[in-house]
């Protein structure tokens, strides 16, 4: 039985690593050295730290996992995740841990495989833009922006990895008539 538990833990570890490696926010932080010169090592350490966190805390709530991951990214990579991916990654990790607790190695393998297949290669490049305030003056305001592109199997997409469309019929959609001329969107309450 100890062999099966070790196998399940190894599968959980592989799933955690797959989820973190597929996380665009972490990819960008590592690729751009937000964690300093040891960003790659910190990313590898992060997988072990997350695994240990789950092993020490068997009954974690989703918000606790989100807080832990957010705190690690803030402290280790000086990165605040605001793209909505933090709850998704936290949910994936929590689901994998539930499979681990039940000893469901097949589900762990399937989740890790699915995450790896959907993994996108994310690159962020700094763009320099300059606007002249007056054509006669040489003063230039420069702004540094980041352009993020994601590719999955060679196909480039803007922003983040494609996600499945929500199947909830009650999901709120923005209609063209709700967008007014000045760019504001009218938000209506559900009836």
Swiss-Prot record:
Map out region (Disordered) in residue numbers: 149-172
Q: Where is the signal peptide?
A: none
Q: Name one Pfam family in it.
A: WGG
Sorted alphabetically, which keywords does the UniProt record give?
Diamond-Blackfan anemia, Disease variant, rRNA processing
Q: What InterPro entries does its record include?
A: Pre-rRNA_process_TSR2
Q: Does the keyword Kinase apply?
A: no
Q: Name one GO biological process term.
A: maturation of SSU-rRNA from tricistronic rRNA transcript (SSU-rRNA, 5.8S rRNA, LSU-rRNA)
Q: Name one GO cellular component term.
A: nucleus
**Superkingdom assignment:** Eukaryota
Q: Which disease is it linked to?
A: Diamond-Blackfan anemia 14, with mandibulofacial dysostosis: A form of Diamond-Blackfan anemia, a congenital non-regenerative hypoplastic anemia that usually presents early in infancy. Diamond-Blackfan anemia is characterized by a moderate to severe macrocytic anemia, erythroblastopenia, and an increased risk of malignancy. 30 to 40% of Diamond-Blackfan anemia patients present with short stature and congenital anomalies, the most frequent being craniofacial (Pierre-Robin syndrome and cleft palate), thumb and urogenital anomalies.
Describe the task this protein carries out.
May be involved in 20S pre-rRNA processing.
Q: Which family does it belong to?
A: Belongs to the TSR2 family.
Instruction: Report the protein name in the record.
Output: Pre-rRNA-processing protein TSR2 homolog
Which gene carries the instructions for this protein? TSR2
